[in-house]
């Protein structure tokens, strides 16, 4: 890296903020190194840039380092010299990425971002108060605009108004001609005294011509004629708009619009007229506050971006390819030159001049934003050319493709296979890959002349070339260096899609044979990987800090707990579960039953000698386990397998003898006292179930709380090793003959067939509609399948199938479930078929199931028809999964964009506000969705929590509710608890530790610098793919099942979409009591009486009532079943109710599907969706009505206003969907890289917005350190953490 680049790099690292503004013409000239005057690029013979052209070396810098164009000055010694022959500065060629030029325009043009901004009006139309369409007509030389109404003020004579656009080509052309005729008539009749003069005759001709539209005449001449006598002036094109912008007085316009707003319907911000005034007011205030003049929206010079950003590339066979931007610049230069010559000529008719000016305007538009034009400029192959705007926006644009997602050097990818021999923090990387990835480090080691102590040694290779050859030939001498290199360098592994942060983890590399990466089996769950051909990418952290960070934070052995629920994510699966299940199985009558051992070693020796079976029930002295907890001392009744299992669990863990184990000590019921009869106890011992997946998961939960963190990976490793070893010992096989026999189903089929026939007859007679018949048939066959399934479940629990391989696999949780068994030897059942869920379906019945079931099982084999239906269902499943993955990924991206700036940046914000939490119960079925314990654990209190009976303090104020304390609270009659929440955290640019509480991935108080916003978004987005895509409909009657569920419901809440008519429920707008429910001819009338007034709600018969006479109703309570419209709830019951409703509804969606997500993550999202308010009364502030303002900013502002004795601002809460929340970010870089790039950058430029780089995305974009994680640590602290991790490795 050169000195200059080092200096620049330092400069970028010290960027504290970025300001965006509209560049004035003077600014563009300051940027420029010279004017581009020719449309040429490079010479076709010499391939050198043409002087004065788009690649001119005199303007943009030399093509070769320290060499001018003509070759007079070469080499670094002439640095800073300007060649007197060719005018090129002698410097590095990299300046061709920085230096800009300019094109001086003959006629001004409007910037397309300022003149065209759909769907909202453009900035020019808002500032001038002219419609968007009229601005376009003036700019593109269709219609004229009035610049000056002249001396005559009488509207009867001079009917034209200032800034009126004269329609001379459209429907209003006749009216405009009439007005012109009236003015011209007045001139030649009243103002010209000499009736024989040329002007009188001219006026008469114009007067007649305007009467008959078919007669040709020059509009320009007619306007000049009017101007001569009245001073009335019109203009066309960007020059006319520029003149109007120059005349504008921003302060006058601002006060005028404020007055207009006061006179308009101030209370209704939704009113179209008010909306328009608010938009104008916003734009005018932006210009006022930023001290920018609106005239800068019109360009006199066009900047030419550096040539290396729009290169010409030579291909094979003397062909060239070029960036589309060069084509646009060529077009601008050619048209500009042509217009210059026309204007210099002076004899060309005005219509031709105007046409050339329009072409110039269009060419500049195409350069800036080709895709938003009516007819975009096309290449030879009819492809739309990519303009500057197109290079910024979208997935392939600058923001997302180049700044936020870069291709990474020192990386590779390969197929993964299992590596059970590895430790948890290790990964096996093929030797070929290691040599390629670590090549520079290996070469350094080979040519190094000093050892680690600084003593001089003889290098293995004498030069870099020799070292490279040694690596290429895999010389035996290199391996010592290779091992030394990889010992100091962890690698990062990533599996796409990276749905949560555990998709990237660090490992210590180990060299393996072959070409596949070997992955530790315990980390597969976190990566969501399996070994059926998945590929993973490897990345090498290069700098010392990156290596320390990988070790201190990213190492796989540190990621034991999942993020979304704090449960272990490294639970053993499949073979490991099967092995431990086999190991902990108990059987009566096995070899060696009744033997009593004194030590663990004795038991192991007896087993290995074949004297005792693994499953034999034996006794062992409790003294054999000096560090384990027992309720009493004596002889423990257990099995050899369980002795071996408990031996690897380490100390301080109670002896685990049954699935429902005690967390403190092994219970007394398994211990025979010293005076007792051990053999009698063994004979009387009831056989206990073996340890399946759930037991092991519960055990890991316990291990996490009891064992020191550094010892946990070793114990997990031991459990894994036991699992693999004993699943091999179990000799489990799978055969078609293992499948149990089941033969009761035929009688159910016969009964169901009879019933289906009956339904068909009812339908034919008109007693049932087709929808009702379909519904009943589907319900009937589902019932049959449930019967078959339940009988099979009973069948496989029989003693005869106890050791059946397939049953053992399912029972242990290793593989398979009851649904698989039902299909294997019961029936396949109903299959789904494709259906467009989103269409407006009149019958409200979704027919997405084939109503003919597959009666055969896989064991019997399917018929041709059944096979066809089965494959139809399977393909639909695959398609749905692909659709769901894409939709879920997009939602995660939106969530991250809305929340990424939320980082833990303080210990305690000192808030006195919190949320009241209670158990979430499904009101209709009274089933528990989320318990009070789950909602309060790991959070901080606001005030003390007292026992209602004894008044004793359970938890003090501002203290953490631990699991023990949460259990104590739930043991009392307390139903509601006030806890701290991120929603009410008073930190402006982040969240404090106490409001967030415990970090679920560590079980400790969340650390400063944790990016909780991103973690919340990932925790909610990652399980998104598991949510169902179906929208359940069960007929015209609206029930809970009739609503959007799963992913669709989640989308409805996060995007604040109003439910469909048949889904929406009626809510009470008053607090009171249901006085009466009466039935009329068309509806049910519900009368609610409050202390102030009474309301009657008309409920259609298709809706299901939730209230009865005498019921008390609150504001926003549901009167009918269905989903609440969130915006209506906000209007009726306020923001707190909305927040509570959203939390409950999101939790319902996930918990019904069996997915647990902590409340705090949902609250983070809701904080971002509900943190903005809309001003209804600006008080004494500089804000204006309708302006959106952040709640923190408003609180600070009102505090200062009240302390100064001024009127505070009054504002109402708003709820936005995640799309809008991300776009309304305080950072324009973050918002622009999300969506609507053009609009966000335009707005930011007009208000001269400053981005203080507080979030994560902004810092990634500028290439700085993110203000999270180790961004909060010093290099020394990071180095210490890295070194400590190495010491803890086992």
Curated annotation (Swiss-Prot):
Residues annotated as binding Zn(2+) 2: 909, 985, 992, 995
SUPFAM superfamilies linked to this entry: beta and beta-prime subunits of DNA dependent RNA-polymerase
Keyword Metal-binding recorded: yes
Residues holding Zn(2+) 1: 68, 70, 83, 86
EC id: 2.7.7.6
Protein residues bound to Mg(2+): 530, 532, 534
Keyword entries, A-Z: DNA-directed RNA polymerase, Magnesium, Metal-binding, Nucleotidyltransferase, Transcription, Transferase, Zinc
Cofactors required: Mg(2+); Zn(2+)
Cofactor note: Binds 1 Mg(2+) ion per subunit. Binds 2 Zn(2+) ions per subunit.
One family name in Pfam for this protein: RNA_pol_Rpb1_3
UniProt enzyme class: transferase
MF annotations from Gene Ontology: DNA binding; DNA-directed RNA polymerase activity; magnesium ion binding; zinc ion binding
Record's function text: DNA-dependent RNA polymerase catalyzes the transcription of DNA into RNA using the four ribonucleoside triphosphates as substrates.
NCBIfam families (UniProt xref): rpoC_TIGR
PANTHER family in UniProt: DNA-DIRECTED RNA POLYMERASE, DNA-DIRECTED RNA POLYMERASE SUBUNIT BETA
Binding partners and assembly: The RNAP catalytic core consists of 2 alpha, 1 beta, 1 beta' and 1 omega subunit. When a sigma factor is associated with the core the holoenzyme is formed, which can initiate transcription.
Family under the similarity heading: Belongs to the RNA polymerase beta' chain family.
Protein name as catalogued: DNA-directed RNA polymerase subunit beta'
Organism lineage string: Bacteria, Bacillati, Mycoplasmatota, Mycoplasmoidales, Mycoplasmoidaceae
Gene: rpoC
């Amino acid at each position: 890296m050169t000195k200059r680049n080092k200096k620049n790099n330092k400069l970028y690292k010290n960027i504290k903020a970025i300001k965006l503004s509209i560049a004035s013409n003077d600014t563009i000239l300051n940027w420029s190194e010279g004017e581009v005057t020719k449309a040429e690029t490079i010479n076709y013979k010499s391939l050198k840039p043409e002087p004065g052209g788009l690649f001119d070396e005199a303007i943009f810098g030399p093509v070769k380092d320290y060499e001018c164009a003509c070759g007079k000055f070469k080499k670094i010694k002439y640095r800073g010299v300007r060649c007197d022959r060719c005018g090129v500065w002698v410097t590095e060629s990299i300046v061709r990425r920085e230096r800009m030029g300019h094109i001086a325009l003959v006629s001004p043009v409007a910037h397309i971002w300022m003149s065209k901004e759909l769907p909202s009006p453009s900035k020019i139309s808002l500032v001038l108060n002219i419609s968007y369409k009229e601005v376009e007509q003036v700019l593109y030389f269709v219609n004229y605009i009035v610049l000056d109404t002249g001396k005559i003020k009488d509207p009867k004579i001079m009917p034209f108004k200032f800034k009126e656009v004269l329609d001379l080509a459209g429907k209003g052309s006749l009216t405009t001609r009439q007005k012109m005729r009236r003015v011209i008539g007045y001139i030649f009749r009243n103002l010209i005294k000499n009736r024989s003069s040329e002007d009188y005759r001219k006026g008469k001709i114009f007067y007649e011509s305007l009467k008959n539209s078919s007669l040709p005449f020059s509009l320009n001449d007619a306007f000049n004629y009017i101007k001569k006598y009245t001073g009335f002036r019109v203009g066309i094109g960007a020059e006319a708009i520029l003149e109007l912008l120059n005349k504008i007085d921003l302060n006058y316009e601002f006060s005028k619009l404020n007055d207009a707003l006061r006179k308009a319907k101030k209370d209704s911000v939704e009113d179209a007229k008010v909306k328009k005034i608010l938009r104008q007011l916003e734009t005018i205030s932006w210009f006022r506050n930023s001290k920018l003049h609106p005239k800068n929206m019109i360009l006199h010079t066009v900047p030419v971006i550096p040539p290396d950003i729009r290169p010409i590339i030579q291909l094979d066979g003397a062909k060239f390819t070029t960036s589309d931007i060069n084509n646009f610049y060529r077009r601008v230069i050619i048209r500009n030159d042509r217009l210059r010559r026309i204007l210099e000529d002076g004899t060309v008719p005005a219509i031709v001049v105007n046409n050339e000016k329009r072409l110039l305007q269009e060419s500049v538009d195409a350069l800036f934003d080709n895709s938003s034009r009516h007819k975009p400029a096309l290449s030879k192959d009819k492809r739309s050319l990519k303009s500057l705007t197109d290079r910024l926006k979208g997935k392939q644009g600058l923001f997302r493709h180049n700044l936020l997602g870069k291709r990474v050097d020192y990386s590779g990818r390969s197929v993964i296979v299992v590596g059970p021999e590895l430790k948890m923090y290790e990964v096996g990387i093929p030797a070929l890959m290691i040599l390629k990835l670590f090549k520079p480090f290996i070469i350094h080691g080979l040519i190094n002349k000093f050892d680690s102590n600084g003593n001089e040694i003889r290098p293995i290779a004498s030069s870099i070339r020799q070292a490279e050859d040694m690596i290429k030939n895999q010389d035996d001498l290199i391996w010592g260096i290779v091992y030394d290199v990889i010992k100091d360098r962890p690698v990062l592994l990533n599996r796409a899609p990276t749905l949560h942060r555990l998709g990237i983890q660090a490992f210590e590399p180990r060299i393996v044979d072959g070409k596949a990466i070997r992955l530790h089996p315990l980390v597969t769950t976190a990566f969501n990987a399996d070994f059926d051909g998945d590929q993973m990418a490897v990345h090498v952290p290069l700098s010392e800090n990156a290596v320390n960070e990988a070790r201190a934070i990213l190492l796989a052995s540190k990621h034991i707990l999942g993020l979304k629920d704090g449960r272990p994510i490294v639970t053993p699966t499949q073979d490991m579960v099967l092995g431990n299940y086999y190991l902990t199985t108990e059987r009566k009558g096995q070899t060696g039953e009744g033997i009593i051992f004194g030590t663990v070693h004795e038991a192991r020796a007896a087993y290995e000698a074949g004297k005792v079976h693994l499953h034999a029930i034996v006794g062992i002295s409790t003294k054999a386990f000096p560090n384990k907890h027992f309720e009493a001392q004596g002889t423990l009744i257990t099995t050899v397998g369980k002795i071996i299992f408990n031996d690897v669990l380490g100390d301080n863990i109670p002896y685990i003898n049954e699935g429902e184990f005690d967390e403190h000590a092994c219970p007394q019921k398994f211990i025979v006292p010293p005076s007792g009869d051990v053999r009698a106890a063994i004979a009387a011992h009831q056989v206990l179930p073996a340890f399946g997946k759930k037991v092991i998961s519960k055990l890991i939960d316990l291990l996490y709380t009891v064992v020191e963190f550094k010892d946990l990976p070793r114990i997990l490793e031991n459990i894994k090793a036991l699992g693999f070893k004993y699943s091999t010992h179990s000799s489990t096989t799978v055969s078609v003959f293992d499948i149990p026999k089941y033969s009761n189903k035929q009688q159910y089929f016969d009964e169901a067939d009879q019933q289906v026939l009956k339904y068909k007859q009812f339908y034919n007679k008109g007693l049932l509609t087709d929808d009702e018949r379909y519904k009943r048939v589907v319900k009937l066959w589902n019932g049959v399948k449930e019967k078959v399934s339940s009988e099979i479940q009973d069948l496989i629990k029989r003693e005869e199938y106890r050791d059946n391989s397939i049953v053992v696999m399912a029972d242990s949780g290793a593989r398979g479930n009851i649904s698989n068994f039902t299909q294997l030897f019961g029936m396949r059942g109903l299959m789904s078929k494709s259906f467009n869920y989103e269409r407006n379906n009149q019958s409200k019945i979704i027919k997405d199931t084939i109503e003919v079931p597959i009666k055969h099982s896989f064991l019997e084999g399917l018929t041709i028809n059944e096979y066809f239906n089965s494959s139809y269902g399977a393909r639909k499943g695959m398609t749905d999964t692909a659709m769901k993955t894409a939709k879920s990924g997009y939602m995660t991206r939106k969530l991250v964009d809305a929340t990424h700036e939320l980082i833990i940046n303080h210990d305690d914000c000192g808030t006195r506000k919190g949320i009241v939490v209670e158990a979430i119960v499904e009101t209709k079925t009274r089933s528990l969705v989320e318990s009070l314990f789950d909602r309060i654990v790991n959070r901080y209190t606001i005030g003390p929590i007292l026992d209602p009976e004894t008044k004793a303090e359970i938890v003090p104020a501002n203290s953490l509710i631990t699991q023990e304390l949460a259990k104590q609270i739930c043991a009392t009659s307390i139903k509601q608890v006030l806890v701290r929440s991120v929603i009410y955290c008073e930190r402006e640019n982040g969240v404090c530790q106490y409001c967030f509480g415990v970090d679920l991935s560590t079980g400790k108080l969340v650390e400063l610098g944790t990016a909780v916003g991103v973690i919340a978004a990932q925790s909610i987005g990652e399980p998104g793919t598991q949510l169902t895509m179906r929208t359940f409909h069960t007929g015209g009657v609206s029930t809970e099942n009739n609503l959007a569920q799963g992913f669709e419901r989640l989308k409805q809440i996060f995007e604040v979409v109003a439910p469909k008519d048949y889904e929406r429920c009626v809510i009470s707008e008053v607090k009171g009591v249901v006085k009466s429910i009466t039935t009329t001819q068309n509806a049910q009338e519900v009368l609610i009486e409050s202390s102030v007034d009474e309301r009657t709600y008309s409920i259609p018969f298709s809706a299901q009532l939730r209230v009865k006479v005498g019921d008390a109703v609150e504001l926003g309570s549901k009167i009918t079943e269905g989903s609440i419209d969130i915006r209506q709830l906000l209007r009726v019951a306020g923001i707190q109710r909305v927040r509570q409703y959203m939390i409950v509804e999101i939790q319902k969606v996930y918990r019904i599907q069996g997915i647990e997500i902590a409340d705090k993550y949902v609250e983070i999202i809701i904080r971002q969706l509900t943190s903005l308010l809309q001003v209804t009364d600006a008080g004494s502030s500089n804000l204006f009505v309708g302006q959106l303002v952040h709640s923190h900013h408003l609180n600070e502002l009102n505090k200062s206003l009240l302390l100064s004795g001024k009127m505070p601002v009054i504002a109402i809460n708003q709820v936005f969907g995640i799309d809008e929340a991300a776009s309304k970010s305080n950072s324009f870089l973050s918002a622009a890289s999300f969506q609507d790039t053009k609009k966000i950058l335009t707005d930011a430029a007009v208000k001269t917005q400053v981005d203080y780089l507080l979030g994560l995305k902004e810092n990634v974009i500028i290439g700085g350190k993110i203000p999270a994680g180790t961004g909060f640590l010093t290099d020394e602290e990071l180095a210490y953490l890295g070194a400590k991790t190495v010491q803890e490795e086992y």
